[in-house]
C-alpha cells in the first residue's frame, strides 16, 4: 500500500485539489442530510468520533500501515448503517489528510474506506448492541487487501500504467499484510471501545422529564 509511505499518483493543481475536496465534502454532507433518522445528538456524536479517529490516524502515522481508520469505518458501517458509515469514512479521510497530505490519493483512500464501511453495514458484526469480536476481527483483516488494491489505483497515471498494476499489487502485498495484522491488533484492543463511542446514548427530551417543563418556562 504505497500511498501510506509517500508514493502517490498524479499531482493535482491547487484548483483541482480544491474541486476534489469540495466534491468529497459535498458527498459526505449530502449523505448525512439524506438520513432523516439521524438526530442532532447523533450528528454531534458522529462528528466528534470523526475528530477522534482523524487524530488517532495522525498520531499513528509513523507506524507503517497501521490504520485505526479501517477498524473505525468498519464499525461505523456496522453500527450506523452504510449512509452514515460512508460519510464518516470520507470525513475522516479528509480531516486526517489535511495534516498528513491532501491530493489525488485522497479520493482513493476515501473510496477504499467507504467500501469497508458499506461492507460493515452488511456483515452482521453485531448482535444487538454487542460486537461479535471474532467476526469483526476477521473482516478487519481480510478487508485490508481490497483497500490496498483501491489505494494502489491512485498510482495509475503518475508514471505507472495499468499494465503495471499486477506487479504493483504484488510488490505492495507486504504492506497490505502488515495493514491486516495491524487491523487485528487494533480491533482486539480498541474495537469494543470504539463501538461504545459510536452507539448513541438515549438523551431524553428535557421537557419530557417531570418538573423540568415548569422550570424551563420560568427561566
Regions inferred by a protein language model and the residue ranges of each:
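Hydrophobic alpha-helical segments, principally membrane-spanning helices and signal/leader peptides
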Residues: 42, 62, 66, 81-82, ...
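Hydrophobic transmembrane alpha-helices
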Residues: 2-75
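Membrane-embedded alpha-helical hairpins and interfacial helices in multi-pass inner-membrane proteins
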Residues: 1-21, 106-110, 118, 122-219
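Alpha-helical membrane segments and adjacent membrane-interface helices in multi-pass membrane proteins
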Residues: 49-121
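Membrane-interfacial loop-to-transmembrane alpha-helix junctions, especially the N-terminal start
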Residues: 38-46, 81-85, 194
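Generic hydrophobic alpha-helical membrane-segment signal
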Residues: 45, 69, 77, 85, ...
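Short hydrophobic/aromatic-rich motifs at helix boundaries and adjacent loops
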Residues: 23-24, 43-48, 88, 92, ...
Amino acid at each position: 500500500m504505497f500511498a501510506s509511505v509517500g508514493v502517490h499518483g498524479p499531482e493535482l493543481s491547487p484548483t483541482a485539489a480544491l474541486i476534489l475536496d469540495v466534491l468529497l465534502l459535498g458527498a459526505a454532507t449530502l449523505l448525512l442530510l439524506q438520513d432523516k433518522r439521524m438526530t442532532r445528538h447523533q450528528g454531534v456524536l458522529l462528528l466528534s468520533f470523526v475528530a477522534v479517529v482523524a487524530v488517532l490516524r495522525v498520531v499513528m502515522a509513523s507506524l507503517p500501515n497501521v490504520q485505526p481508520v479501517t477498524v473505525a469505518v468498519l464499525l461505523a458501517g456496522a453500527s450506523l448503517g452504510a449512509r452514515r458509515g460512508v460519510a464518516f469514512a470520507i470525513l475522516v479521510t479528509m480531516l486526517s489528510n489535511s495534516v498528513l497530505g491532501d491530493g489525488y490519493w485522497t479520493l482513493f483512500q476515501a473510496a477504499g474506506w467507504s467500501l469497508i464501511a458499506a461492507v460493515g453495514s452488511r456483515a452482521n458484526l453485531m448482535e444487538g448492541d454487542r460486537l461479535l469480536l471474532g467476526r469483526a476481527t476477521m473482516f478487519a483483516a481480510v478487508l485490508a487487501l481490497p483497500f490496498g488494491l483501491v489505494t494502489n489505483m491512485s498510482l495509475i497515471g503518475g508514471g505507472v500504467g495499468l499494465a503495471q498494476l499486477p506487479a504493483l499489487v504484488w510488490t505492495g502485498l507486504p504492506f497490505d499484510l502488515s495493514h491486516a495484522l495491524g487491523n487485528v491488533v487494533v480491533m482486539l484492543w480498541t474495537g469494543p471501545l470504539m463501538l461504545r463511542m459510536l452507539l448513541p446514548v438515549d438523551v431524553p427530551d428535557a421537557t419530557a422529564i417531570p418538573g423540568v417543563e415548569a422550570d424551563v418556562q420560568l427561566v
